[in-house]
């Protein structure tokens, strides 16, 4: 919807923008100074983009290549102005960037908002508020802008009071770039002060690679204003170009917020200058919290790319594998050409070398964190563990390293916390144990209560419990660790005989022989509904279970395919009965074939329910159970 008069029109905000403006004003007021960080960061990005475009078209500088950000305020008019002489915007750019949120996962973001202001403020921080943060301190915002290389009469003015609409009109603007004029609310007037502005710039924008200046007016001896001048406030040296020993942790943390637009401090970072075959500097951060849309395949990820300190592009995903898409930061290469494009990056030897080095650097950071600060690593794992698991299929060269970083729950602790690494499991293995036992299930509750665990608990053998959706797929790539094979305890090939003494083995052999006719009778009744029927001694309190062949698709994988809308091959189960269980003994003693069949239906139904959580024909199961109960 829009009304237009000559070159001026009033347009309605995209509905998500209205919602975001309302949320920011009410959720971020306690941290209102971040508006300045966001607006200066945007101005810095605009300068980076101009510098990049001017590589192929020097006329865009319009005779002025000295880039910078300038702040001035007018107490009488109650305004604060943030100006840059960067790339600027056309009318179409203004409508696209200031009237809509062109982000993947926007609907998902809004669906996760609550009425809890502290939680919402964290989520908004992850989403990245950018320009809209101006409305935290201003009740009206005017933007005057002109795109570099356009005529002076092609400037654009945008104005909004942060309600449902905004106006846009053509203006004449002498200089390229953007002026953002904030008409301050009462609670924003503290920023109409030179010292307050200097404090905030020093805190948030010292690392910006271009000058950030304030218009200052000194007083003479009589208290009258002298002629004003621009005073540079920040160091204006790109942080990653400085020596590590000269950079405080607080500076690294603020730079992270600049590149990520996150509100929280990162968990850790790595700053490295490498000289040799490839000359480059990398500054890589691991966030403390996962972005709301991390599992969305359209989620923008990748590093900022600079070549010889000149900004080239955002979200250069070629330098980081997909399973490390949560990593933020930048890479500054001396070896790539300044006119590099995404297409050139794709098949470039330098790119491949830098990608390999950055991947090893991140995995090294994680290994160091896991060894030195277990609590911090578990914080990382809770946020990013499921994504890291993807690396087992994606990055065969680093498979062993990634496997060492995995964390799982086990039967050793009555807790769903995924806290044990595979190296820790191997250390605790029984002397005669040569395999890593694991179980996959839909949930922690289903895993810890699985009947398949009964003998393991009785013999004190630890089992890894896997219940993330990705885990069954994961295990098709993770076949061994530290020379130890993985063994699913729901597969037919499970052999626990080495944990039995000779007396147990002899007893089992005798029982197996005694139950031979019961097994044959059960198989005869079931026909081809099951692959095989056999006795098992791995159960204690459960009468029967179903298992799959070692090379047949497991239950969890079949369910995963079905959930994704793909056809899963029919799983043929092996039906295992516990000859020591009272119900199985009753079944064995039943002479009447019809009644025997009801026992088989009930025990198989129970086993299928425990394994799959559902039955193909529940009425048959209920009928058999009801008839047995009615006897």
From Swiss-Prot:
Which InterPro entries does this entry report, sorted A to Z? HATPase_C_sf, Heat_shock_protein_90_CS, HSP90_C, Hsp90_fam, Hsp90_N, Ribosomal_Su5_D2-typ_SF
Q: Is Nucleotide-binding a UniProt keyword of this protein? A: yes
Which portions of the sequence form the region A?
Answer: 1-342
Q: Where in the cell is it found?
A: Cytoplasm
Q: Region B: which residues?
A: 343-559
Region described as C: spans on this chain: 560-631
Tell me where it mainly resides. Answer: cytoplasm
The family line of this record is: Belongs to the heat shock protein 90 family.
Its subunit composition reads: Homodimer.
The name on file for this protein is Chaperone protein HtpG
* Gene that encodes it: htpG
């Amino acid at each position: 919807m829009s009304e237009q008069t000559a070159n001026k029109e009033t347009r309605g905000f995209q509905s998500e923008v209205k919602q975001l403006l309302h949320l920011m004003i009410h959720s971020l007021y306690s941290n209102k100074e971040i508006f300045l960080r966001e607006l200066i960061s945007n101005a810095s990005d605009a300068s980076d983009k101009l510098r990049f475009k001017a590589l192929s078209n020097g006329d865009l500088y319009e005779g002025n290549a000295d880039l910078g950000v300038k702040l001035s305020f007018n107490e009488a008019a109650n305004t604060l102005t943030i100006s840059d002489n960067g790339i600027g915007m056309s009318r179409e750019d203004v409508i696209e960037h200031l009237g809509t949120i062109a982000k993947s996962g926007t609907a998902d973001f809004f669906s996760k908002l609550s009425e809890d202001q502290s939680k919402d403020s964290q989520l908004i921080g992850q989403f990245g508020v950018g320009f809209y943060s101006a409305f935290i301190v201003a009740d009206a915002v005017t933007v005057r802008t002109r795109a570099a290389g356009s005529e002076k009469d092609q400037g654009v003015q945008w104005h909004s009071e942060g309600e449902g609409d905004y106006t846009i009109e053509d203006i004449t603007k002498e200089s390229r770039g953007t002026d953002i004029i904030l008409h301050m609310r009462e609670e924003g007037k503290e920023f109409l002060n030179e010292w307050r502005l200097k404090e905030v710039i020093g805190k948030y924008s010292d690392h910006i690679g271009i000058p950030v200046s304030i218009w200052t007016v000194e007083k003479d001896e009589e208290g009258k204003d002298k002629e004003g001048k621009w005073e540079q406030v920040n160091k204006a040296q790109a942080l990653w170009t400085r020596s590590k020993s000269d950079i405080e942790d607080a500076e690294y943390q603020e730079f992270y917020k600049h590149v990520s637009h996150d509100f929280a401090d990162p968990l850790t970072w790595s700053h490295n200058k490498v000289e040799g075959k490839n000359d480059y500097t990398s500054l890589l951060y691991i966030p403390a919290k996962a972005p709301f849309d991390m599992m969305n395949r359209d989620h923008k990820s990748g590093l900022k790319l600079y070549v010889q300190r000149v900004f080239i592009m955002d979200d250069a995903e070629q330098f980081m594998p997909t399973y490390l898409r949560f990593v933020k930061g930048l890479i500054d290469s001396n070896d790539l050409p300044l006119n590099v494009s995404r297409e050139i990056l794709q098949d470039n030897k330098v790119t491949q070398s830098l990608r390999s080095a950055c991947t090893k650097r991140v995995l090294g950071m994680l290994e160091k964190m896991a060894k030195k600060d277990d609590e911090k690593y578990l914080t990382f794992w809770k946020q990013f563990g499921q994504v890291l698991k993807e690396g087992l299929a994606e990055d065969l060269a680093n498979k062993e390293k990634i496997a060492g970083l995995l964390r799982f729950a086990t039967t050793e602790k009555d807790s769903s916390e995924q806290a044990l690494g595979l190296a820790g499991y191997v250390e605790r293995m029984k002397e005669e144990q040569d395999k890593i036992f694991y179980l996959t299930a839909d949930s922690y509750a289903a895993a810890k209560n699985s009947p398949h665990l009964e003998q393991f608990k009785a013999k004190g053998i630890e089992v890894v419990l896997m219940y993330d959706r990705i885990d069954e797929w994961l295990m098709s790539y993770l076949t061994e660790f530290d020379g130890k094979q993985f063994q699913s305890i729901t597969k037919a090939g499970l052999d626990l005989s080495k944990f039995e003494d000779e007396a147990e083995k002899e007893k089992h052999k005798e029982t197996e022989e005694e139950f031979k006719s019961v097994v044959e009778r059960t198989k005869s009744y079931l026909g081809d509904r099951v692959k095989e029927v056999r006795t098992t001694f791995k159960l204690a309190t459960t009468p029967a279970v179903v298992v799959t062949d070692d090379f047949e698709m497991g239950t969890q994988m079949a369910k995963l395919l079905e959930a994704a809308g793909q056809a899963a091959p029919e799983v043929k189960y092996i039906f295992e009965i516990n000859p020591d269980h009272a119900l199985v003994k009753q079944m064995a003693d039943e002479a009447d074939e019809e009644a025997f069949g009801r026992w088989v239906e009930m025990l198989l139904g129970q086993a299928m329910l425990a394994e799959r959580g559902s039955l193909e024909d529940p009425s048959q199961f209920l009928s058999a159970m009801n008839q047995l109960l009615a006897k």
